Regions:
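C-terminal regulatory/interaction module of P-loop NTP-utilizing enzymes
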Residues: 1-151
């Protein structure tokens, strides 16, 4: 028995896509290599290298909608498991917040704040704190994806 590690590798991803005549540095205007490497660098910084995304997640990508689907239906659920107690880190990974910590337009990972002031006319002696509800932008665009690796 032998264990051989296959770390994340954007070059393998680019080579596989090239076999299908897809330029991984320009998939409908999205630099998939840069996006992949940026997400993994942020995961490594916020968690560790053992939790980085594998290149296999993106090997079947043919257009920017495929990238958006991988992000929404594969990457986000994985990150929600990784950061179940701190979903704002997912916003950091996707560069969804501006320099003031406010949600960017076209962000990948949104949040809404549920405020007791908006939901109850009276709370009595209860001290109810606002709660943030996090979710994937239902209208991911190429611009949303580019925003991950560009400020």
């Amino acid at each position: 028995f032998q264990f051989k590690a296959f770390p994340s590798n954007s070059h393998i991803l680019a080579d596989v896509l090239a076999q299908h005549d897809i330029n991984a540095n320009d998939v409908d205007g999205v630099d998939l290599v840069r996006l992949f490497d940026t997400i993994n660098s942020r995961i490594e910084l916020l968690l560790d290298a053992n939790h980085m995304l594998g290149h296999a997640y993106f090997m079947k990508v043919r257009n920017s909608q495929d990238i958006a689907d991988v992000i929404a239906y594969k990457v986000v659920p994985l990150l929600e498991e990784y950061f179940f107690d701190d979903p704002q880190k997912i916003q950091l990974i996707f560069n969804s917040l501006n320099v003031n910590g406010e949600l960017k337009e076209n962000a990948v990972y949104y949040h809404e704040e549920l405020s007791p002031d908006n939901l109850f006319s009276y709370t009595g002696e209860y001290d109810i704190e606002p709660v943030k509800h996090f979710f994937v932008n239902p209208n991911l665009t190429s611009e949303s994806l580019v925003q991950i690796y560009q400020g």
